């Protein structure tokens, strides 16, 4: 009898099984979650075809450099074939947000839901990315990465696709959704190819036309420092930002700070 020695104690973590996956809250300080697992409403919408989790493998990259993409409007054209017309970032609390629209070489087409690709993309914390997408189809994209050691992560992708007719999915809808998910996966794989080849860049030099990279890096610090410091980092980064020379996505962002 007696207390269990600290060295022999087994730690426990908050675990939820939802959306076809297992989610674990990890806090090295041992604290309870200070934000909830986001609700993916489209998962339960019967007019959407639920996708499958694509495991993309392990990546030798610090997750901070993956999150950089939320501010990297400049890569959308050369990497993904987008012609960005409007773009903005917003940072608030545990969310980092990107809103953008423009043409795209693979995810829009004649007769689709939208002539341009519109994405409303949110990071919920440092590793859960979701995006409402309107292009050839209306869809809901999920990209998750899990750190497994310093500078190494595992990555997953999923896509829910709304039927073009707005009704319950037919067999043809399921086939079309699977094809569209593959197109989405291949578009994301273009980022994966860059990450797998690049050297670490943990202390980069930023210039005004780069966008809100520095704000994104400051936002990210709240997750890799004591929780008590989070408010200090948020004070330095919260707000909406538009890259120099770019048009804001939303009208109320016209007066937003130029990144």
Give the label of every model feature segment.
Residues 30-259:
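C-terminal catalytic domain of Rieske-type non-heme iron oxygenases
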């Amino acid at each position: 009898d007696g207390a269990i020695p600290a060295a022999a104690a087994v730690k426990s973590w908050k675990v939820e099984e939802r959306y076809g996956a297992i989610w674990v809250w990890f806090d090295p300080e041992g604290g309870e979650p200070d934000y909830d697992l986001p609700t993916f409403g489209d998962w339960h919408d019967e007019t959407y075809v639920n996708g499958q989790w694509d495991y993309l493998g392990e990546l030798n990259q610090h997750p901070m450099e993956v999150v950089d993409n939320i501010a990297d409007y400049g890569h959308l054209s050369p990497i993904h074939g987008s012609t960005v017309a409007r773009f903005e970032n917003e940072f608030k609390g545990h969310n980092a947000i990107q809103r953008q629209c423009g043409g795209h070489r693979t995810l829009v087409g004649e007769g689709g839901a939208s002539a341009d690709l519109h994405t409303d993309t949110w990071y919920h914390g440092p590793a859960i990315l979701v995006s409402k997408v309107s292009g050839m189809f209306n869809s809901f994209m999920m990209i998750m990465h899990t750190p497994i050691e310093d500078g190494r992560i595992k990555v997953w992708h999923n896509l829910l696709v709304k039927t073009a007719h707005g009704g319950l999915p037919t067999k043809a809808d399921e086939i079309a959704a699977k094809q569209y998910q593959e197109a989405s996966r291949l578009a994301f794989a273009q980022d994966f190819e860059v990450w797998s080849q690049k050297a670490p860049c943990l202390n980069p030099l930023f210039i005004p036309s780069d966008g809100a990279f520095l704000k994104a890096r400051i936002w990210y610090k709240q997750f890799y420092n004591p929780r008590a410091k989070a408010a200090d980092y948020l004070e330095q980064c919260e707000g909406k930002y538009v890259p120099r020379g770019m048009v804001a996505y939303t009208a109320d962002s016209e007066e937003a700070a130029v990144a």
